């Protein structure tokens, strides 16, 4: 009876963890989608460590939700095969999350390097491409910055007029405020340092969250293994 009572407690805790996994899965998907939207607005393009991280987060979130569903079915029916499958796949998810967390830490400086290269490349296209101009203007206005390293970077763009910066560099944005500008009226700090630092910080936050979720998943694996052992022993946990 004591064993059966203990296993009922384990089963209840497993249900609680499964609900937590579902919540974490939804959270991961939301964070991944949000990060992807942010990166799409900061012109980080191509299959780079920075741009692939949101995709990995979304994939892990979807997979975690499916695995939690399998675990719920296995716990309800006390099905040995389903619980084994749940434990194995949860272990795989945990390994992916730990790997993603490590990758996020290792490539935190790479994210800034990618952003710097892309930002300078797109500055060249600013006068030629309205879509690029719109993205750069939004970034400069939102982060209160101007140019890559500083506002003088705009002077190096051949197609830009002399003594001119985009209007989005102005402290108080008005039409034509960037023409023959006064240095006191524009943001002097570069966008690479401001936005790149923000990106690195958020990569580390996501990495820390992944490690936290992985710790909870360890508990899920332990409880699942306990339930599997109980099922094999023939105890009634209902």
Swiss-Prot record:
<dbReference type="GO" id="GO:0032585">
    <property type="term" value="C:multivesicular body membrane"/>
</dbReference>
<keyword id="KW-0964">Secreted</keyword>
<feature type="glycosylation site" description="N-linked (GlcNAc...) asparagine">
    <location>
        <position position="130"/>
    </location>
</feature>
<dbReference type="GO" id="GO:0005615">
    <property type="term" value="C:extracellular space"/>
</dbReference>
<dbReference type="GO" id="GO:0044877">
    <property type="term" value="F:protein-containing complex binding"/>
</dbReference>
<dbReference type="GO" id="GO:0032991">
    <property type="term" value="C:protein-containing complex"/>
</dbReference>
<dbReference type="GO" id="GO:0045785">
    <property type="term" value="P:positive regulation of cell adhesion"/>
</dbReference>
<keyword id="KW-0458">Lysosome</keyword>
<dbReference type="InterPro" id="IPR008952">
    <property type="entry name" value="Tetraspanin_EC2_sf"/>
</dbReference>
<dbReference type="GO" id="GO:0097487">
    <property type="term" value="C:multivesicular body, internal vesicle"/>
</dbReference>
<dbReference type="GO" id="GO:0010633">
    <property type="term" value="P:negative regulation of epithelial cell migration"/>
</dbReference>
<dbReference type="GO" id="GO:0031902">
    <property type="term" value="C:late endosome membrane"/>
</dbReference>
<feature type="transmembrane region" description="Helical">
    <location>
        <begin position="82"/>
        <end position="102"/>
    </location>
</feature>
<dbReference type="GO" id="GO:1900746">
    <property type="term" value="P:regulation of vascular endothelial growth factor signaling pathway"/>
</dbReference>
<dbReference type="GO" id="GO:0031088">
    <property type="term" value="C:platelet dense granule membrane"/>
</dbReference>
<feature type="transmembrane region" description="Helical">
    <location>
        <begin position="204"/>
        <end position="224"/>
    </location>
</feature>
<comment type="subunit">
    <text>Interacts with TIMP1 and ITGB1 and recruits TIMP1 to ITGB1. Interacts with CD9. Identified in a complex with CD9 and ITGB3. Interacts with PMEL. Interacts with KDR/VEGFR2; identified in a complex with ITGB1 and KDR/VEGFR2 and is required to recruit KDR to ITGB1 complexes. Interacts with SYT7.</text>
</comment>
<dbReference type="GO" id="GO:0010008">
    <property type="term" value="C:endosome membrane"/>
</dbReference>
<keyword id="KW-0653">Protein transport</keyword>
<feature type="topological domain" description="Cytoplasmic">
    <location>
        <begin position="225"/>
        <end position="238"/>
    </location>
</feature>
<feature type="topological domain" description="Extracellular">
    <location>
        <begin position="33"/>
        <end position="51"/>
    </location>
</feature>
<feature type="short sequence motif" description="Lysosomal targeting motif">
    <location>
        <begin position="234"/>
        <end position="238"/>
    </location>
</feature>
<protein>
    <recommendedName>
        <fullName>CD63 antigen</fullName>
    </recommendedName>
</protein>
<dbReference type="GO" id="GO:0048757">
    <property type="term" value="P:pigment granule maturation"/>
</dbReference>
<dbReference type="GO" id="GO:0031904">
    <property type="term" value="C:endosome lumen"/>
</dbReference>
<feature type="glycosylation site" description="N-linked (GlcNAc...) asparagine">
    <location>
        <position position="172"/>
    </location>
</feature>
<keyword id="KW-0813">Transport</keyword>
<dbReference type="GO" id="GO:0005654">
    <property type="term" value="C:nucleoplasm"/>
</dbReference>
<keyword id="KW-1003">Cell membrane</keyword>
<feature type="topological domain" description="Cytoplasmic">
    <location>
        <begin position="2"/>
        <end position="11"/>
    </location>
</feature>
<dbReference type="GO" id="GO:0035646">
    <property type="term" value="P:endosome to melanosome transport"/>
</dbReference>
<keyword id="KW-0564">Palmitate</keyword>
<dbReference type="GO" id="GO:0070062">
    <property type="term" value="C:extracellular exosome"/>
</dbReference>
<keyword id="KW-0449">Lipoprotein</keyword>
<dbReference type="InterPro" id="IPR018503">
    <property type="entry name" value="Tetraspanin_CS"/>
</dbReference>
<feature type="transmembrane region" description="Helical">
    <location>
        <begin position="12"/>
        <end position="32"/>
    </location>
</feature>
<feature type="transmembrane region" description="Helical">
    <location>
        <begin position="52"/>
        <end position="72"/>
    </location>
</feature>
<dbReference type="GO" id="GO:1901379">
    <property type="term" value="P:regulation of potassium ion transmembrane transport"/>
</dbReference>
<comment type="function">
    <text>Functions as a cell surface receptor for TIMP1 and plays a role in the activation of cellular signaling cascades. Plays a role in the activation of ITGB1 and integrin signaling, leading to the activation of AKT, FAK/PTK2 and MAP kinases. Promotes cell survival, reorganization of the actin cytoskeleton, cell adhesion, spreading and migration, via its role in the activation of AKT and FAK/PTK2. Plays a role in VEGFA signaling via its role in regulating the internalization of KDR/VEGFR2.</text>
</comment>
<feature type="topological domain" description="Extracellular">
    <location>
        <begin position="103"/>
        <end position="203"/>
    </location>
</feature>
<dbReference type="GO" id="GO:0005886">
    <property type="term" value="C:plasma membrane"/>
</dbReference>
<dbReference type="GO" id="GO:0035577">
    <property type="term" value="C:azurophil granule membrane"/>
</dbReference>
């Amino acid at each position: 009876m004591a064993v059966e009572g203990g296993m009922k407690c384990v089963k209840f805790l497993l249900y609680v963890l499964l609900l937590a996994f579902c919540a974490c899965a939804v959270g991961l998907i939301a964070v991944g989608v949000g990060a992807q939207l942010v990166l799409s607005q900061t012109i980080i393009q191509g299959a780079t460590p920075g741009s692939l991280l949101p995709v990995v987060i979304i994939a892990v979130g979807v997979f975690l939700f499916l695995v939690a569903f399998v675990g719920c079915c296995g716990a309800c029916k006390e099905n040995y095969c389903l619980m084994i499958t749940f434990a194995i796949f949860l272990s795989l998810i945990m390994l992916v999350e730990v790997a993603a967390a490590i990758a996020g830490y290792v490539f935190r400086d790479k994210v800034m390097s990618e952003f710097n290269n892309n930002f300078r490349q797109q500055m060249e296209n600013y006068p030629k491409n309205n879509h690029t101009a719109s993205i750069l203007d939004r970034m400069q206005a939102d982060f209160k910055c101007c140019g890559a390293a500083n506002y003088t970077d705009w002077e190096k763009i051949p197609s830009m007029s002399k003594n001119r910066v985009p209007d989005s560099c102005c402290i108080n944005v008005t039409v034509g405020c960037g023409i023959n500008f006064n240095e006191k009226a524009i943001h002097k700090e570069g966008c690479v340092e401001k936005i790149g630092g923000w990106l690195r910080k958020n990569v580390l936050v996501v990495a820390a969250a992944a490690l936290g979720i992985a710790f909870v998943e360890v508990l899920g694996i332990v409880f699942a293994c306990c339930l599997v052992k109980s099922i094999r022993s023939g105890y009634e946990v209902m």
